[in-house]
């Protein structure tokens, strides 16, 4: 990572790899028109990776997200050269947004504050690299394409990087580097927790950037395959038994399955309310759903991506508990994909609940628009 950091410090781009994807990236503070031209010639759309805090501070959330978590903007000029775009990006990340045209050809992407330790994505790794090199936490990157216009795989990317003298790093390299030098969860206390319906657990309390989080642990979890549920906080579903979602039923089923197994972990993720938008915003989304929006479009209408959750903190808690091989209770493929990047061996265990008339549109939207693995009986 030191070689990669040194390269970007000198204002030169590097290559990042993530399984079957690759991208060229550079800290936003040193992007130039020449680099943008190079990206436009060899890559797909240009992305500007910013934290959610930066997006709010710059007022960019007033524009609608497109394609999930992207906001397309440009400088408000008649004709826009690559150098003018580069200058616009540099001024934007320094806090001087100026006049903004929407939509545009620079795609702002929301990244997590704690980088790859919170979400192991290309955008987060690029921002982490910028931080590591001493720049502001923002980066410009673009997915590499083949000469034929297809997505560049690893072999093509490695050859391309060699031809253009670009150092290469992988997301897992950044994760390993940061885990060795940083710790974002702290185990504070452990106590016995007898429950009314699910037997007795060990309640392990952690301090994290998302707040205080509890992991309910049953049996030896530092060996063999371990049943794991990473459950997103849902006051309305878990406590008030709302029919709008299936969250409460999923939590109950998971705890029952762990109790029957006699071994497992349930992590209750604070800060995940409303897929990360918070309780009041979730209620606002409910109101929009009453007016005809689905659960995904309601979040977008409020100025949020469809899903702001990430699972890096849960991954660090599982590491602290010495869990290595996971049978993950989930219907969310994103959760599986993210946790695998932290080195866990994972097999999915479906968690099925019976839909009702009220939550059926919600579940269908999650399946159709977010790719959740939900089966409906005819």
Curated annotation (Swiss-Prot):
Q: Establish whether keyword S-adenosyl-L-methionine is in the entry.
A: no
Catalytic activity of the protein: GTP + 4 H2O = 2,5-diamino-6-hydroxy-4-(5-phosphoribosylamino)-pyrimidine + formate + 2 phosphate + 3 H(+)
Swiss-Prot/TrEMBL cofactor(s): Zn(2+)
Query: EC class of this enzyme?
Result: hydrolase
EC identifiers of the protein: 3.5.4.25
Q: Which GO terms describe its cellular component?
A: cytosol
According to its UniProt entry, the protein's GO biological process terms are: riboflavin biosynthetic process
Known pathway: Cofactor biosynthesis; riboflavin biosynthesis; 5-amino-6-(D-ribitylamino)uracil from GTP: step 1/4
What family is this protein classified in?
In the N-terminal section; belongs to the DHBP synthase family.
Protein name per its UniProtKB record: GTP cyclohydrolase-2
Q: Which organism is it from?
A: Archaeoglobus fulgidus (strain ATCC 49558 / DSM 4304 / JCM 9628 / NBRC 100126 / VC-16)
Gene that this polypeptide is encoded by: ribA
